[in-house]
Amino acid sequence: THERSSAASDVYKRQALIRDKNFFNWLELNSENLALFEKNEMKQMIRRCAELHMHQISNGGDPFEMGSARPLDFGHWSAHKLESMTNYRLRHGEAVAIGIALDARYSVLAGMLDKGLEERICCLLEYLGFKLWNVAIEKTNKDDGLELIKGLKDFQEHLGGELTITLLKNIGVGFEVNEIDISIVQESIQWLKERQK
């Protein structure tokens, strides 16, 4: 079930959060059956994801993601770093769920996303079985800075030199930014830690 849950986080963020508010609403309405991996709901979810993915490939302008804008990487800058920081004990989908939560909160604190929507996003992730905190998030480096923040630099290199992060304007509406305010990232991390208490 870990593998199925991990795949669900990719579905959730790639398709519903950055592209399709109605799909997000459907996920919420069907979350109980999705959490149980009920066949009918899973088939509907997979079909809608495939449709949205095909739309991105055929209409996105960059089907092989050769440029720096990669909307399907929503939640990934921190996820990639968390995976390596935990020696991959944290699975990709689990790390992406945390990344989604951080980026949703960042979107709120930066004034892009309405307050309360980040909580709605987190609640659905948790209902689907994801833990949105890991002690590695607080790991510091030799300079007493958060090791996770280095994930931004790593992600920039992964993108070929230009930092492009997908954030949210609304559920179903993703957009790219080229700069990230570290202090807002730190506030987002603190918020995520406090909501786990």
Briefly describe each language-model feature range.
Residues 1-8, 12:
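Single conserved hydrophobic/aromatic residue that forms the stacking wall/gate
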Residues 8, 68, 160-162:
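A structure-centric signal for secondary-structure junctions around beta-strands
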Residues 14-15, 105, 109, 157, ...:
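Amphipathic alpha-helical interaction elements
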Residues 22, 29, 67, 166, ...:
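Residue-level signal for pocket-adjacent positions within structured domains
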Residues 25-145:
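Active-site segments that bind and position negatively charged phosphate/pyrophosphate groups
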Residues 112-197:
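C-terminal charged capping/lid subdomain of soluble metabolic enzymes
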